[in-house]
């Protein structure tokens, strides 16, 4: 599959399209075929190096797609479900705590990829009246 990697943070010239293996979801993960992604200011800051990240990071925090595989322990999702990313995947409820406010695309690989394996709790269902392209624009701005 193809994915975009930030070979080294510090400039847009360091973004490259690369080949990668399709990931295998762990027992608590789902495999999503990414249909659409959207860009936001966070993604630019990561690429420019203003938000620290590792070399070869797959950027982008906002996307929508279809589940194509579910891990053995996942019960809340099924193949074919339309889902989108969430802005803070580790913050499930309650007052925000600093350690829970990491973004996909800076502390872990993001959605600039054809397929992503991600924790089942790190996604949400797309609105029924939005297509996948429209849904991909919601995670950050919809918060």
PLM features per residue range, with description:
Residues 13-18, 63:
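Short beta-strand or tight-loop elements
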Residues 10-15, 41-43:
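Short N-terminal binding/cap micro-motifs at the start of the first secondary-structure element
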Residues 115-123:
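A short glycine-rich beta-alpha junction/loop motif
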Residues 42, 90-95:
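A short beta-to-alpha transition loop/helix N-cap that caps and shapes the active-site region
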Residues 21-37, 47-92, 107-110, 122, ...:
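Glycine-rich beta-strand-centered segment in the early N-terminal region that forms part
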Residues 1-2:
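Extreme N-terminal starter segment of soluble prokaryotic enzymes
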């Amino acid at each position: 599959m193809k994915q975009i990697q930030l070979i080294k943070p510090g400039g847009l010239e360091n973004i490259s399209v690369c080949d990668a293996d399709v990931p295998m979801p762990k027992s608590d993960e789902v495999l999503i075929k990414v249909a659409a992604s959207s860009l936001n200011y966070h993604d630019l800051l990561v690429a420019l190096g203003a938000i620290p990240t590792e070399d070869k990071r797959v950027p982008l925090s906002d996307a929508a797609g279809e589940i194509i595989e579910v891990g053995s322990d996942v019960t809340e999702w099924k193949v074919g479900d339309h889902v989108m990313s969430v802005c803070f995947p580790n913050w499930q409820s309650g007052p925000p705590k600093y350690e829970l406010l990491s973004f996909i695309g800076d502390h872990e690989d993001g959605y600039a990829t054809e397929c992503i394996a991600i924790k089942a709790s790190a996604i949400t269902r797309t609105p029924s009246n939005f297509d996948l392209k429209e849904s991909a624009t919601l995670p950050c701005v919809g918060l």
